[in-house]
Curated annotation (Swiss-Prot):
Pfam families: Kelch_1
Keyword Plastid carried by entry: no
Biased composition (Pro residues): 104-115
Gene3D superfamilies to which the protein is assigned, alphabetical: Kelch-type beta propeller (2.120.10.80)
Low complexity bias (residue ranges): 116-126
Residue stretches of each Kelch repeat: 306-354, 355-405, 406-448, 451-493, 495-538
UniProt KW keywords: Kelch repeat, Repeat
Region called Disordered, residue ranges: 1-174
The name this protein goes by in its record: Kelch domain-containing protein 7B
Domain of life: Eukaryota
CDD domains: BACK_KBTBD11_CMLAP
Length: 594
């Protein structure tokens, strides 16, 4: 498309690039000043306009009349047809400068005769406002060629002026701006690209040093970052150490929502499995003081008329310890000392997530005896005792049961209430109280198939069931044995209740939680009618009292006591034995000897 030659009225000019001069073009007093050349103008389709004191230049090389601002004569308006074409071209988006090449240069228009303006005068002249860019704005690079128009006609040729430093500075500034935008785009999250920077060494020589440094600073505050580094760089050893750290401190991880919520379901399962997967489960026992040890006892008297003998000095009670059993050596050994602050008399005990919890109890003796609401926790993987959130109500002779990651404190002396502890919120919340008419003191409780069962003690042969989903209690069928119950455990969907028979020993009654039926499983003769206290490990039920440590094995449809008797616990003659199961770490002496 060919455009006619016509003058343009003065218009505001936007910021643009400077058209550079073609080597060989004359540079003299008639050329434009640097202050005006710093913003290169744009032209309409087919014509490239150069601005200067010499006027406007057409691409065809014909000089045009100067505008009224230059020579004082008004410029005629362009024909209507050309005005419309200019409007359409202005509405198009401007092309990037890098895409607009240059063609051969045209000689600049001659300046009319007259005195040349001095350099200071030219600097003092106001810089005219730049026009809006057109689509065919000239590219700043003199090595590029003109792109043909859509109609197929060649575009006009652009005149240039001397490549001033100011012009080159403006072009480089725009290039730097484009490069900056590109880098910002590449740095956006999402993996569109990688900004060129310091490259990682191809060898992995630095990674062992980095992993060693991360191991030194590994704690619960940095474990997520270290785990991400280990997974990204293929460091299974470092990842395993991070999992082990979180597993060793599971209660703190559960109580930190910022940490626990950022773990995936697979990570949570792995951390939980490590609590019991890095050692061997062992049988443990804690001797709880008898409820009547703190009561008054009369002094022995001699023959009539004689003064009673002087009372022997009262010795301080020995510190309580947790003990564990070594089945290969058939011996018991102490594991750790129980804190003196923990009131053991009448407390509840259970294990959850390989932690041992002690809750409630009676502190003091006589008229100063008070119930406690404190809860203590022992971590066998770190050998550390700690305290968790106290219960809402002080309790003694309660039962503590773990179910689905929650602790349930059930009943107590003169109490029908129940409350539940969630380690993730570190809070106790009340639950449905036991049915009216029950008196849950010295009772037994166990969890089986998602429900909690309570029997024994002052409940005698009654069996109560609590559903956490419904938060409600109901009563199960009575046991066929109306004898005194000593303990109850769950194994394989069945409840095994150990009743005490005077002059005979212990009788085991089995309850099917699906069919709701009772049956007699086995019996065990005992030298003395001492209650049995039980716990389960695998398919074996360990039954303890001060005289015997027996094993009751359930295999398939048969359940019977084993003939081999284990070493009785030697220190349980003055208290109540409370057995439990814990998994000790491999570094423990008992495990290393095995």
């Amino acid at each position: 498309m060919v455009l006619r030659s016509h003058p343009f009225p003065r218009q505001d000019r936007p910021q643009g690039s400077v058209p550079r001069a073609v080597p060989g073009s004359p540079v003299g007093p008639s050329t434009s000043t640097h202050s005006e050349d710093r913003h290169g103008p744009s032209s309409s389709v087919g014509t490239v306009i150069g601005t200067g004191t010499g006027g406007l230049v057409e691409a065809g090389g014909q000089p045009q009349p100067r505008s009224s601002e230059t020579n004082g004569s008004p410029s005629p308006d362009p024909p209507p047809g050309l005005r419309g074409e200019g409007t359409r071209e202005k509405s198009l988006d401007p092309l990037p400068q890098a895409a607009m090449p240059r063609g051969p240069a045209q000689p600049p228009a001659q300046r009319p005769p007259g005195p040349a303006a001095s350099s200071s005068a030219r600097r003092s002249q106001p810089v005219p406002q730049l026009r809006k860019r057109s689509r065919c704005e000239i590219a700043p690079s003199s090595e590029q060629e003109v792109r043909p128009a859509a109609s197929g006609d060649p575009q006009g040729e652009a005149p240039g002026e001397g490549g001033s430093p100011a012009g080159r500075s403006g072009a480089l500034t725009e290039k730097q701006e484009e490069a900056r935008k590109l880098m910002v785009f590449l740095q956006r999250p999402g993996g569109w690209g990688v900004v060129e920077g310091p490259r990682k060494p191809s060898s992995r020589a630095l990674e062992p040093a980095t992993a060693a440094a991360l191991r030194r600073r590994l704690d619960l505050g940095s474990c997520l970052d270290v785990l991400a580094f280990a997974q990204q760089h293929g460091e299974p050893g470092l990842a395993q150490e991070t999992y082990a750290l979180m597993s060793d401190n599971l209660l703190r991880v559960l109580g930190d929502p910022c940490l626990y919520r950022r773990l995936s379901a697979a990570d949570r399962e792995r951390i939980l499995s490590l609590r019991t997967g890095r050692g061997r489960a062992v049988l443990g026992v804690l001797v709880l003081p008898s409820l009547y040890q703190g009561g008054r006892s009369g002094l022995p008297r001699g023959p009539r008329g004689e003064e009673p003998p002087a009372a022997a000095p009262v010795s301080l009670p020995l510190p309580a310890h947790l003990h564990v059993f070594n089945p290969r050596e058939n011996t018991w050994r102490p594991l750790t000392q129980v804190p003196e602050e923990a009131p053991l008399r009448g407390c509840g005990l259970c294990t959850m997530h390989n932690y041992l919890f002690l809750a409630g109890g009676i502190r003091g003796s006589g008229a100063k005896a008070v119930c406690s609401n404190e809860v203590f926790c022992y971590n066998p993987l770190t050998n550390i005792w700690s305290q968790v959130r106290p219960m809402q109500q002080a309790r003694a002779q309660l039962k503590l049961v773990a179910l689905d990651g929650l602790l349930y404190a059930i009943g107590g002396e003169c109490l029908y209430s129940m409350e539940c502890y969630d380690p993730r919120t570190d809070a106790w919340t009340p639950r449905a109280p036991l049915p009216a008419g029950t008196f849950p003191v010295a009772h037994e409780a166990v969890a089986c198939r998602g429900d909690i069962y309570v029997t024994g003690g002052h409940l005698f042969y009654r069996l109560l069931r609590y559903s956490p989903v419904k938060d409600a209690w109901d009563e199960c069928p009575y046991s066929a044995s109306h004898r005194r119950s000593s303990d109850i455990v769950a194994l394989g969907g069945f409840l095994y209740r150990f009743d005490l028979l005077r002059g005979v020993g212990a009788a085991v009654m089995r309850y099917n939680t699906v069919t709701g039926s009772w049956s007699r499983a086995a019996s065990l003769p005992l030298p003395a009618p001492a209650p049995l206290h039980c716990t389960t490990l695998g398919n074996t039920i360990y039954c303890l009292n001060p005289q015997v440590t027996a094993t009751f094995t359930v295999s398939g449809g048969t359940a019977q006591f084993q003939a081999k008797e284990l070493q009785p616990f030697p220190l349980g003659s003055t208290g109540v034995l409370s057995p439990f199961i814990l998994t000790l770490p491999p570094e423990d002496r008992l495990q290393t000897s095995l």
